[in-house]
């Protein structure tokens, strides 16, 4: 009888441990996308606007705009095709020079007199082609870290992206498109004032050093391309998230803007599998997510 009780107790303890293990490995509760409103102090707010275009409002109220392809973007809500709808912008980040990422950055920079930052050497080319004036470019090095708002503000690090970065420019003298060097493609690790970290991956294929970058910076949220053709598709994006990065949250991006970008969020979630520990958040363009 004593032996039978011991066996039952051991089985119960094993079951309890398994339950506890399941709880610890469950996806983090996902914040729900919502319509935009006034900034909630202490929160990181992420507004995805289609493709890779993103507006991040930091807990301290700084507004960082990434890859603002808006006026020509079929996924951008009509309201945000008016660039003034972005509100005051404190910083523009560009991951690379392709038109669906460079987008409206020169117009926003010029109108608001806010600098364009790039970690891969694009800035001098923007100036030489007359897209912006030299005072509106703030280049920094790939793998470099900047703190443009001081030691207590957000911290931005440029990290590797496996992509290309041609800058296609229409020469006004010939009315023909020309292809120019656009610097190196990058992604950005953005650490907020409260320590919350976002990895905006820009355009990238799968590469093994995603694991090293994730171990070094430990991002809470990965904004990851899933459309395929030019970037990772759902399967590779799932490998990146599940096996290399392991963030608490993931927002899929860079899909659905052209027939070539066929990957979908549902395919991405299916590829991750039922045991994934990352909560996938799928906002509609123009919906804001607060963390």
UniProtKB/Swiss-Prot annotation:
Alphabetically ordered keywords of this record: Hydrolase, Plasmid
Membrane-spanning intervals of the chain: none
GO molecular function, one term: hydrolase activity
Record family assignment: Belongs to the UPF0173 family.
Name listed for the protein in its UniProt record: UPF0173 metal-dependent hydrolase Rmet_5695
Native source species: Cupriavidus metallidurans (strain ATCC 43123 / DSM 2839 / NBRC 102507 / CH34)
């Amino acid at each position: 009888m004593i032996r039978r009780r011991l066996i039952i107790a051991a089985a119960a303890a094993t079951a309890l441990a398994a339950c506890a293990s399941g709880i610890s490995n469950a996806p983090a509760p996902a914040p729900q996308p919502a319509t935009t409103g006034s900034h909630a102090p202490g929160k990181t707010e992420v507004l995805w606007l289609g493709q890779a275009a993103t507006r991040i409002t930091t807990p301290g109220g700084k507004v960082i705009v990434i890859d603002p392809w808006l006026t020509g973007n079929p996924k951008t809500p009509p309201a945000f095709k008016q660039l003034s709808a972005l509100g005051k912008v404190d910083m523009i980040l560009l991951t690379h020079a392709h038109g669906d990422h460079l987008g409206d950055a020169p117009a926003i920079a010029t109108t608001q007199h806010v600098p364009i930052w790039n970690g891969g050497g694009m800035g001098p080319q923007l100036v030489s082609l007359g897209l912006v004036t030299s005072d509106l470019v703030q280049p920094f090095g790939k793998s470099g870290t900047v703190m443009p708002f001081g030691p207590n503000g957000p911290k931005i690090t440029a990290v590797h992206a496996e992509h290309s970065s041609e800058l296609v420019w229409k020469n006004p003298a010939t009315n023909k498109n020309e292809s120019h060097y656009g610097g190196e493609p990058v992604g950005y690790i953005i650490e907020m004032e409260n320590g919350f970290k976002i990895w905006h991956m820009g355009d990238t294929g799968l590469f093994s050093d995603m694991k090293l970058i994730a171990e070094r910076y430990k991002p809470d949220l990965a904004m990851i391309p899933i459309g395929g053709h030019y970037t990772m598709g759902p399967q590779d994006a799932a490998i990146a998230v599940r096996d290399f990065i392991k963030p608490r949250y993931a927002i899929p991006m860079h899909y659905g803007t052209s027939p070539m970008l066929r990957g979908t969020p549902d395919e991405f979630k299916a590829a991750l599998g039922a045991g994934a520990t990352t909560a996938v958040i799928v906002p509609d363009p123009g919906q804001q997510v607060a963390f």
